[in-house]
């Protein structure tokens, strides 16, 4: 009978440890470790690369979102300063209108006739308003007519959105003017920020209720930005930057047309133009080189085949020249009727 002494026990432990070590390190004892046949290890190596790519994509996505939210917050902060300056300017303008005639100030203020028309229209809306929230909504209709067109892009806008990623904010600078007008009509030119926020929240509820009646038609939808490709990398980058500012293809068309045909819209001559010559109806054809630029920018962004995109793009160009919605004042009666109900 073997008597285990402390020395024997220590020797036994050392022998067993060496045997186990040799067994693990020996390729013949563990053939799965062979690199040529270790498919599991290879699989994990591939997954790690894919995982890294996914993480990079997520990181880029969140960085872009963070950048967008930061820019929105900066705009909101700038709008607060703008509100105070605009209010002082509005009060001075009202005093000037009361003490002088339009003829007297025509030479001193550029575009005074347009400003006077705007002032006259918004005053007419304010006079018949009985509710601050309805007045604010009516002024949104008046100041953002292009958002309430056939593409229903207003669906994606809010005054105080719960999510700055999901919804866009109406121009804070135009909202400042609306706030000043509401304050003047209902609050004797005084309205604290929390009260204005309550009014904005009520307007957002009205927008939500109206949004439930509509959807953005497929023809007005845009491709995801990562799927947009131009003729070159430079073109692709430029188009993506344009699309990033739009929510529908109609809005993209409008943005490009206002850049390329700015003089026509500024002078009012746009009324005489259409996509093609139309002698019978007295319309002049638009510059074909500029129209080609419109197609090159818009078509890659539409989620349809190029031939279909070309037809739709042409229709949107004609539609916009028939009724350019960015020109405010055309829907004055609609706004007055809304607040009068």
From Swiss-Prot:
Keyword Cytoplasm (UniProt): no
Subcellular location: Host cytoplasm; Host nucleus; Membrane
Transmembrane stretches, start-end: 7-25
GO MF annotations, alphabetized: DNA binding
Induction: Expressed in the early phase of the viral replicative cycle.
Assigned protein family: Belongs to the orthopoxvirus OPG067 family.
Protein name: Protein OPG067
Lineage, highest ranks first: Viruses, Varidnaviria, Bamfordvirae, Nucleocytoviricota, Pokkesviricetes
Name of the encoding gene: OPG067
